[in-house]
Swiss-Prot record:
The gene is gloB. It comes from the Bacteria. It comes from Actinobacillus succinogenes (strain ATCC 55618 / DSM 22257 / CCUG 43843 / 130Z). Thiolesterase that catalyzes the hydrolysis of S-D-lactoyl-glutathione to form glutathione and D-lactic acid. Zn(2+) 2 binds at D56, H57, D125, H163. GO terms for molecular function: hydroxyacylglutathione hydrolase activity; metal ion binding. This is Hydroxyacylglutathione hydrolase. It catalyses: an S-(2-hydroxyacyl)glutathione + H2O = a 2-hydroxy carboxylate + glutathione + H(+). Its EC number is 3.1.2.6.
Length: 233
């Protein structure tokens, strides 16, 4: 089970679980949409994963901990004062039912991390469908390296970003990429999904390698140029 729960204006709280197992929750934006979903489906929670410190990713953690005080909350050092109880940077988290790879993906924030388990990539604000995150407390070189790190994952990896930015990202991608065919095809599909109020994600890493300019950028300089252009797009 892999479920993006809409929160705030365009955030997704991700819930993932193997059959008959407690679930993992990624980036608790707010408690309100998450709690009813967990209760209606009678899901226990095995772990919470935080990608970075921004309020739209951790704003519901304190409330969650009031309902689930014994659930471990994993996150980078920058989340220590945001509710993280177990600090991670890279390596592996092993719980009763899951093995979760932790990948350092700084750039959007300096200590941002991403998580991979069972072929699902929870990449927060590092990688979006057809885009990548803005650079705030990290730097462009760091963000480029992070995206390159994610690019090495298998093509069938499910990309699970934290925002519904896909249509805007596709518009930018079409403006800068030489081969626009895959971008145009994906835009048609995403427009239909969004018209039906369905999420555009997850996608696959293989697809992202065709439609995401930040995975296609040939060098750090081109990456930085495109990222700065996207900021003004």
């Amino acid at each position: 089970m892999l479920k993006p729960i809409s929160a705030l204006n365009d955030n997704y709280i991700w819930v993932y679980g193997r059959e008959n197992c407690p679930v993992i929750v990624v980036d608790i934006t707010e408690i309100e949409p998450l709690l009813p979903f967990l209760r209606e489906n009678k899901f226990a929670v095995e772990a919470v994963l935080l990608t970075h410190k921004h309020d739209d990713h951790v704003g519901g953690v304190a409330a969650f901990k009031r309902y689930f005080p014994d659930v471990p909350v994993y996150g980078p050092q920058e989340c220590a004062d945001k509710g993280a109880t177990r600090i991670v940077n890279e390596g592996e988290i092993v719980t009763a039912n899951y093995r979760i790879r932790v990948i350092p993906t700084g750039g959007h924030t300096a200590q941002h991390v991403s998580y991979v388990t069972d072929g699902c990539l929870f990449c927060g604000d590092t990688l979006f469908s057809a885009g990548c995150g803005r650079v705030f407390t990290g730097n462009y070189g760091q963000m480029y390296d992070s995206v390159q790190r994610l690019k090495t994952l298998p093509d069938d990896t499910l990309v699970c970003p934290a925002h519904e930015y896909t249509l805007a990202n596709l518009a930018f991608a079409e403006s800068v990429m030489k081969d626009k065919s895959a971008v145009k095809n994906q835009r048609v599909l995403v427009e239909k999904k969004r018209a039906e109020n369905r999420p555009s994600v997850p996608t696959t890493l293989g697809l992202e390698k065709q439609i995401n300019p930040f995975l296609i950028a040939e060098n750090p300089a081109q990456f930085e140029t495109w990222r700065k252009a996207k900021d003004q797009f």
